[in-house]
Regions:
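ABC-type ATPase nucleotide-binding domains, specifically the catalytic core motifs of the NBD
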Residues: 1, 28-43, 56, 68, ...
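ABC nucleotide-binding domain signature
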Residues: 2-3, 7-14, 78, 123, ...
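Short amphipathic alpha-helix in the helical subdomain of ABC transporter nucleotide-binding domains
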Residues: 5, 44-48, 62, 169
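Short helical segment in ABC ATPase nucleotide-binding domains corresponding to the A-loop/adjacent helical element
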Residues: 17, 23-35, 45, 49, ...
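Short catalytic/signature loops enriched in Gly
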Residues: 55-58, 62, 152-206
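P-loop NTP-binding/switch modules centered on Walker-like glycine-rich loops
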Residues: 87, 91, 95, 99-181
Length: 206
């Protein structure tokens, strides 16, 4: 499992400040994973510089501690760590949570550019459907631990089929077109200890 982690699949957690060690310099946190996987020390040091260039941070910032970086820079640093061993798959768990919309946009553009340049795949986990249309080719909608709908991104946004997907689509405002009243999803999430039979969403179907 250790050989698999970071070399075949890596993860970007939703809170960069919590994901980073507060008492280690960023440089050490990037090189640590490479050294653990047998990369030569000098090669790891150069790779850390290259990774910071890649994610748009001045290499001089490698000697900073996490609290000395802005939220957007910390998120980029976490992405750099995740890419240290060039994994073909990157899991991103709410990578733009707690960032303002301008920084969110910059991070998403950075991720898209890196994916084009390096050719890795992304499993992007989020509750914000507006982010998915920016970055995804295919989308799976989960409710209470089950995938209730999956489709190509454009198809899902233009013609959602499942009532839960429709509820999600109606619960956030559109930035274009006529004004529409936002509609919440009635009811409460199910008790997963004793879930309803059949589709777990059926007690909330309107």
């Amino acid at each position: 499992l250790e050989a698999f982690r970071w070399s075949k699949i890596s993860i970007v957690f939703q809170s960069a400040m919590n994901a980073l060690n507060p008492v280690m310099k960023i440089r050490d946190q990037i090189t640590d994973v490479m050294l653990h996987h047998g990369v030569d020390k000098s090669e790891a040091a150069q790779r850390a510089v290259d990774l910071f260039d890649l994610v748009g941070i001045e290499p001089a910032r490698l000697d900073a501690y996490p609290h000395q970086l802005s939220g957007g820079m910390r998120q980029r640093a976490v992405i750099a760590i995740a890419l240290a061993l060039k994994p073909p798959m990157l899991i991103m768990d709410e990578p733009t949570t707690a960032l303002d919309v301008v920084v969110q946009k910059d991070i998403l553009e950075q991720i898209t550019e890196l994916r084009k340049k390096l050719g890795f795949s992304i499993l992007f986990i989020t509750h914000d459907l507006s982010l998915l249309v920016e970055i995804s080719t295919h989308i799976s909608i989960m409710y209470a631990g089950d995938i209730v709908e999956k489709a190509p991104a454009r198809e899902l946004f233009e013609n959602p089929k499942h009532p839960y997907t429709l509820g999600l689509m109606n619960s956030f405002p559109s930035i274009s077109g006529a004004k529409q009243k936002l509609v919440g999803i009635p009811g409460s999430p199910p008790d997963l200890v004793a879930p309803p039979s059949g589709c777990k969403f059926h007690p909330r179907c309107a």
